[in-house]
UniProtKB/Swiss-Prot annotation:
Main location: membrane
Protein modification: N-glycosylation is important for dimerization.
Descriptive protein name: Cytotoxic T-lymphocyte protein 4
GO biological process, one term: adaptive immune response
Record membrane topology: Single-pass type I membrane protein
Compartment(s): Cell membrane
Gene: CTLA4
Source organism per UniProt: Canis lupus familiaris (Dog)
Oligomer and partners: Homodimer; disulfide-linked. Binds to CD80/B7-1 and CD86/B7.2. Interacts with ICOSLG.
Keywords linked to the UniProt accession: Adaptive immunity, Cell membrane, Disulfide bond, Glycoprotein, Immunity, Immunoglobulin domain, Membrane, Phosphoprotein, Signal, Transmembrane, Transmembrane helix
Glycan-bearing residues: 113, 145
Amino acid sequence: MAGFGFRRHGVQPDLASRTWPCTALFSLLFIPVFSKGMHAAQPAVVLASSRGVASFVCEYGSSGNAAEVRVTMLRQAGSQMTEVCAATYTVEDELAFLDDSTCTGTSSGNKVNLTIQGLRAMGTGLYICKVELMYPPPYYVGMGNGTQIYVIDPEPCPDSDFLLWILAAVSSGLFFYSFLITAVSLSKMLKKRSPLTTGVYVKMPPTGPECEKQFQPYFIPIN
């Protein structure tokens, strides 16, 4: 039993001495990889358009050799943070959110122009840009301070039937007004013509004395 116990205690230090260099090497290789930070900058405030579209630029500090980048849009509400959209792209290719129509974006160097669509007033909040340099190692991750996006819902459009009634009323008023103006104008024209006629038509007899008894004057009254 003593021999077994000695052999048992002798094996443990030997295994530990063999595995310790591998563990140390593994730690030295991977611990720095996950501990590197990166700065990301984004505007403090953005006002969405009347159509619910907001855009801003997320700029990150690049090491110069990043080939694969992942961009994530986060929304912070109180103490909770939810993912709005995310996309992974290579530097040679264009940034595209394939599985989400809410977000669109373009990339240029270490700048990413992000656009969020379909925002409503209840979507007002702090939106944070998170950038990860995935490949090649080392792995970098950076998060911006957040962009406060304000969304104002547009005023509802009036009822189309109500607009049609207003248009019909205005058209009818213009028609009757033009009809009245025309009637008044015609009445004034007729009144201007009436003084030109005397109301009595006299037929003059011939000047010769021989025809004096053949023609008698007469008149036509005009009411």
